[in-house]
Amino acid sequence: MGLLSILRKLKSAPDQEVRILLLGLDNAGKTTLLKQLASEDISHITPTQGFNIKSVQSQGFKLNVWDIGGQRKIRPYWKNYFENTDILELAELLEEEKLSCVPVLIFANKQDLLTAAPASEIAEGLNLHTIRDRVWQIQSCSALTGEGVQDGMNWVCKNVNAKKK
Amino acid sequence: MFISLWEFFYGHFFRFWMKWLLRQMTGKCELQRIFDTYVGAQRTHRIENSLTYSKNKVLQKVTRVVQSEVDKYVDDIMKEKNINPEKDASFKICMKMCLLQITGYKQLYLDVESVRKRPYDSDNLQHEELLMKLWNLLMPTKKLNARISKQWAEIGFQGDDPKTDFRGMGILGLINLVYFSENYTSEAHQILSRSNHPKLGYSYAIVGINLTEMAYSLLKSEALKFHLYNFVPGIPTMEHFHQFYCYLVYEFDKFWFEEEPESIMYFNLYREKFHEKIKGLLLDCNVALTLKV
């Protein structure tokens, strides 16, 4: 292989960009999750008005993670962010047309609390077993300690790969 | 490269000889010359730098002492620098005030930090009373039906229990909200009613908590030094921190409605713009930001 073709090959495989929407109820821990992903300080977080966005590199992907405020008042704005979304992280939105076939990852957060419901219970509560039109996964995690967060992202990268091919 | 070389020579060589030369010419040490030339925050700031970068161990230490020891250290500095209290009577007074401001700023950060680290606790009667006080101040004519209630959204909390909204700011967020509502009641009512604007509206309480974060991080990064050195001739206290918070709340509301953002979804964009504006104002050594109504 000549130098030129190596260069050409490098050029033809730029980082794929993936758009991830983080949605959920207020005080679910979306911003903490986002900051944990970006390895930022999580001790000064305040409720999100509007949204936060961060880009993180993972396994050759550029993940653009959108963290949208969960407050009831701003949920009507969620749909403005649905265009071109690669991964989705909440079940309520499965019927939204713009999001059909988008893989869904549910983070069962706050597992560091003794009172947290286990992932299996949440899966049952959300009737995840009835989802047929897309791949889905439930991942227990603690955004506070970072446990399980990376596992979730690995699943994201794997499934985006499968979807795009 | 050239600049860092210059800084190296200046710090290690020229600064010493410059000071020596000036001392021979004026018969005064650097600290005295600063008192002669500067006032306000610029004076305190220069004294602080002169002490911090001093090669003298006694002088270096004084910016890190506690308030109760300030008197003793002023005497130490005067002994170390051979300053005759009869020839320069004002030195002792000026030095004391500067040291109170310098050490006071550091103490204020520690005090604010300890309040911030205290999470809101529903089992703490004081916390609960403070929360009810906030409701009564903002909604004097409306009764809260229950402690857990959808009504909290009317003053801009997210859910039916405000407890979860304080998060990283802890009880500091609530104390700030109550302080503003109590000391600027009519302004608070006006801002609350404006925040319910159908198009430009925002959530009053959580934006308030967000501005607590702004005030806190400005204090932490030492950006508030010029402001507090100008504003408080002595030890800055919690009260002064709350006052600055009130300034932010009042100014942010004005800024938001002047900018006319498309929707609340652009909050962080405008928040950052406002943050930059405030940081710019705080760079001026004559700054003193007060809420003028």
Curated annotation (Swiss-Prot), chain A:
GO MF term set: GDP binding; GTP binding; GTPase activity; microtubule binding
Sorted alphabetically, which CDD domains does this protein's record hold? Arl3
Q: How does it sit in the membrane?
A: Peripheral membrane protein
- By its UniProt entry, which SUPFAM superfamilies does this protein fall under? P-loop containing nucleoside triphosphate hydrolases
BP GO annotations: cilium assembly; Golgi to plasma membrane transport; kidney development; mitotic cytokinesis; photoreceptor cell development; protein localization to ciliary membrane; protein transport; small GTPase-mediated signal transduction
GO cellular component, as recorded:
centrosome; cilium; cytoplasmic microtubule; Golgi apparatus; Golgi membrane; midbody; nucleus; photoreceptor connecting cilium
Record PTM Phosphoserine, positions in chain: 5
Q: Where in the cell is the protein located?
A: Golgi apparatus membrane; Cytoplasm, Cytoskeleton, Spindle; Nucleus; Cytoplasm, Cytoskeleton, Microtubule organizing center, Centrosome
Write out the entry's keywords from A to Z.
Cell cycle, Cell division, Cell projection, Cytoplasm, Cytoskeleton, Golgi apparatus, GTP-binding, Lipoprotein, Membrane, Myristate, Nucleotide-binding, Nucleus, Phosphoprotein, Protein transport, Transport
Asked if the record carries the keyword Lipoprotein, the reply is yes
Q: Lipidation, kind N-myristoyl glycine: residue numbers?
A: 2
Amino-acid positions noted as binding GTP in the UniProt annotation, renumbered to this chain: 24-31, 67-71, 109-112
The entry assigns this protein to a family as follows: Belongs to the small GTPase superfamily. Arf family.
Q: What does this protein do?
A: Small GTP-binding protein which cycles between an inactive GDP-bound and an active GTP-bound form, and the rate of cycling is regulated by guanine nucleotide exchange factors (GEF) and GTPase-activating proteins (GAP). Required for normal cytokinesis and cilia signaling. Requires assistance from GTPase-activating proteins (GAPs) like RP2 and PDE6D, in order to cycle between inactive GDP-bound and active GTP-bound forms. Required for targeting proteins to the cilium, including myristoylated NPHP3 and prenylated INPP5E.
Q: Which PANTHER family match?
A: ADP-RIBOSYLATION FACTOR-LIKE PROTEIN 2-RELATED
**Oligomer and partners:** Found in a complex with ARL3, RP2 and UNC119 (or UNC119B); RP2 induces hydrolysis of GTP ARL3 in the complex, leading to the release of UNC119 (or UNC119B). Interacts with RP2; interaction is direct and stimulated with the activated GTP-bound form of ARL3. Interacts with SYS1. Interacts with ARL2BP; the GTP-bound form interacts with ARL2BP. Microtubule-associated protein. Does not interact with TBCC. Interacts with RP2. Interacts with PDE6D; the interaction occurs specifically with the GTP-bound form of ARL3.
Name of the protein described by the UniProt record: ADP-ribosylation factor-like protein 3
